[in-house]
Amino acid sequence: VSHVEDRAARMLTAPGAPFAVARGEDGGLFYVDGPRTLVEFVEVTWGFGDQVFLVGERSSYSYREFLAAACALARRFTEGYGLRPGDRAAMVMRNCPEWQIAFWAAQLAGLVAVPLNARWTVAELEYVLDDCQPRVLLVDGERLALVDDWRRRAGARVITFEHEGVAEGGERYEDFPAVDPRSAPPQVEVRAEDDATIFYTSGTTGRPKGAVATHLAQAGAAQHPRYHAAAAALGSGRFPGQGAAPVALMTYPFFHVAALTALYSTMSVGGTLVLMRRWDADDALALIARHRVTHFSGVPTTALDLLDAAERTGDDLATLTHFSTGGAAAPPALVTRLAARYGHRIEPRTGYGLTETSGGVLAVSGDEYRNEPAGAGAPAPAVEVRIVGVDAEPVPEGEPGELWLRGQSLIRGYWRDEAATAAAFEGGWFKTGDLATVRDGRVAIVDRIKDIVLRGGETVYCAQVEAALHDLPAVADAAVFGVPHDRLGEEVAAVVRLRPGAAVTMGELTEQLADRIAAYQVPTLLSVGDIPRNAAGKTLRGVLRSRAQGLRNG
């Protein structure tokens, strides 16, 4: 770690500096300056006026047009629908500019935005909708059929986007009156301690849990990428904020918290987001060239796909200046490959974050990342790191232990689940379940303690897939685990024990699973066999993983 980088961090966090922090009554750190709510954060973007903010396949918006549209929709929520602060607004859409209008309209109306995975099945969506009970659904035409039965039973309002027809009892966004460019937000009090978002993350019980972040937490999450960008600029001899505003390619789906980090960093400086509805490397190359994209960010799978496509087509990615990965651990070879082909022209970045931290809280970039490609970087100023052993006591520097985090951007808990909240937090510290080390203030993730599989940036919880397998009539027992995969990082594997007399093929089991869980969760390696367990009855996933790799290599 260079003295320049450490000096830059001190400059940015000194008393009176833009990212100075203080300790709150709960013991955690918070930013002294900056927004206290997402309403304060988004209202500042009015100053960017006619600069282009959102570019989609069918529509685009300047900052002025976006904010006016969000204000108009927020007033419809409060004045037309009678929604009140604290009511939930659920979004089930692929990436499009109107997704952002819906999200920020919810914030301006004091509602709690609940972004839902657009890839979920009917059963998965209905479970979560039953849990959070939204009063309004904001859906695209493709997903209306998935939620329509639920919203009829619940009596929830529905607004459809990019949809030809009109849902019975609902409204179509395209039919709303033209937006008055002078639209103002509704007169609603939004406080720092009010809930702002619920992002659902699956737990070891196999059921999704709603991670609830307050406005203060999300405002902190918005500061983290600003700090890391400023520190990176100073560390490389540049003044923060110099040059043109970024043009960023948004490959993360908006329902993932990884998208928040990319969104906040772009919005805070008046940059442009070029949206992708679904990932395709060749389409990405075309968008980068057409819109002169400067910043790429995505999960390692998409990053590798983009590099492959660029090499295959001879595209030199001439406009790119920044190349970031998140959502899953990037293979060290990725940054080595980027440097070998593009030198220092494109700055690499990566980091670490969770649903429970409202996005990225650690980051590393530039030469530090090139020299330490396995690192996850340093924490943002309002984030504290602790590495503990099995006794929950801190371990010596450099020794592995469980990573605990505390700070402004952490969630307040899980939606209506006190037991899960109590299990995940201790004295204000969130227990990540990840094994990590810290040296010189820099964190490296060693392994995962929790039984999860990171498949191409998607988090697959073994217990959730096992629960779906156990629901199948032919299955008596099941164990799910991850095995290495060259492109995806990991793929999902499962071993099942069939009920006596059951006559079913692995293909039939796969088809049955596809009706219960999202496609990325369905095991690609499925076999029948014994399931080894220890004396306590816990599955020996390491044994299963070795068996699967042996069969694949043999």
Please give the residue ranges for each predicted region.
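Conserved pre-ATP/AMP-binding loop-to-beta segment of ANL
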Residues: 180-200, 206-207, 237-247
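Conserved AMP-binding/adenylate-forming core of the ANL superfamily
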Residues: 30-34, 50-84, 90-96, 100-104, ...
